């Protein structure tokens, strides 16, 4: 059991290309980076397990990559990518709103937003389960979302878009993630099985 890693973490996508079942969406995100047409706020919506947080992390890393590949992926070699991969990046911050949903939590985040990045162009703030923020926390966050510093990008993720205030929705580019199809799920299971040296019949995977 030593060094055991849960498969969901071991095979979590780390590039746009490896994201399962969201090709149109990841292509749009890559194009936004390539053309330097980045919004200050994004809202990733969809059911659990479709890749919202994973895509947010890949997007955040690629935004700050100093030498993106010709395919629009992060290089994983520059200081910004290395810092992210080693979980020591000061430019990418994550907040789980399910357990950090108070006004004080948001005010602390707003204070961080004011400080420009030391490396790279942007500081990216990923707020997961954003619908869990209290009404007062949403209101405290709204002004920053209305007038963000040029170096700040927010990526909000939610399973319940209908709970987000209209004033927040109107300031975000909204991306609706698809449910992952049976075909894509089976193909990914086959890939994982092959990597693990497991022989699996197609009927078993399906």
Language-model segment annotations:
Residues 1-174, 181-184, 190-194, 202-203:
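P-loop/Walker A NTP-binding region and its immediately flanking N-terminal helices
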